C-alpha cells in the first residue's frame, strides 16, 4: 500500500472504541462549527440587510438543503466504496474508486446544475414565495445552485479523505471555509453592497477554495489520489457499484427534507407563535442531529474498511462501541437541552412570550428523550449501508418519510401541534424496527464480497 501508507488511519487494527472516537471527534467539532457558521450567517444577513432579506434567504433554505443533502449522501456513498477497497488493501481498486468518483461527480455536477438553474423560477412558484421577497429569493437560490460544482467537489474530496482514515484535514478546511465565508459575507454585503447574492457568492467561493486546498493536501498525503489514464479503463463495474451505493444514500438524506417540509407546513398553519417556538426548538434539536451525523460518518468508514478486510468480528465490536459512544453523547444532549431549553430559546428571540415557550417546550420535552432511538437508527443504518446492503436502508427511509408525513398531516386535525412533536420519534422507531433485525441477520451470515 505504498500509495497510502504515509497518512492513512487504518481502522482495521487497534481498539475499535478508541479508533472510532479518535475518528469521530474531529467530525463532531466540524459539524458544530458548521452550525455556528450557519447561525452567524443568518445574523449577518438579518442585521445588515433586514428582515425581508433574511426571509428571502430562509424561504429557499429547504430547497438548498435538499440539494446539499443529496450531494453529501451521494458523495458519501462513494466514500464507502473507497473505504471498502482501502480495508481490502486493494490499491488498484482504490484508484478505480477515485477515478469513478471523479467521473461521476463531474457528470452529476453538470446535470444537476442545469436542472436546478433552469427550474429556479418554477421552484419559487411551487413554493408560493411572497412577491415582496421573491426577487431576492431567486437571486440567492440561483447563485447557490449555479455553484453546485463547488459543493460537489468539496464533499467528494472530504469524503475521500475520511474514507482513507483522515478526519482531521476535512475539519481544518471546514473551519477555514466557515471563517472565510463569514469574512466574505461581511465584505460582499457591507462595503460592496451585493445584497443576498453576495451571501450566496460567499458560500460558493469559500467552499471552492476549501475544496482546492483540501485536494492539494490530499494529493500530498495520499499519492493514491494521483490518477493515471489507465485508472479510467474498465470502470463499468466500479461505476455501477458507486451508483448503487451513492444514489440510495443521496436519496435517503434528501428525502428527509420532504418530511420536514410537511412538518413545517403544519406548524405554519398554527400561527406566528408556533412558528417561532418550533424554529427555536429546531435549532437546539440540530445539535443532536449533528452529533449523530458525525457518529454515522465514523462508523460508516470503520465498517467499510473492515468489510473490505473481511473482519466480521471487528465490525460487530465496532458497532457495539459506536452504540455506547453515540448513546452517551445523546444522553448528554438530552439532559443539556432539557435543562437549558429556555436560555436556548432566548438565544434566538429577544423577548419570547409564554405562548412561544409553550411550543418550544412541547417540542423539546417530547423529542429529546427519544434521541436514543435516533442514535440506534444512525449506527445500524450506516453499518448496513457500509456492508453493501442498500435495499434495507432505502426501505427504512421510505418508512421514515411515510410515518413522518402520516403523523403530521394525518393527526394534526386531532392533536394539533403534538403531531409535529411525535412525528420524528415515530419515524425513527419505524425505521429501527426494520433495520435492527436486518443487521443481526446479516451478522449471522458470511460477509458478502466487497469486490
Give a label for each model feature:
Residues 27, 31, 43, 80, ...:
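Transmembrane alpha-helix boundary and packing residues in multipass membrane permease domains
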Residues 11-49, 65-77, 81, 106-113, ...:
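N-terminal transmembrane alpha-helices
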Residues 75, 144-162, 170-178, 199-212, ...:
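Short runs within selected transmembrane alpha-helices of multi-pass transporters and secretion channels
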Residues 45-65, 132-136, 196-197, 238-245, ...:
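Interfacial/gating helices of multi-pass transporter permease domains
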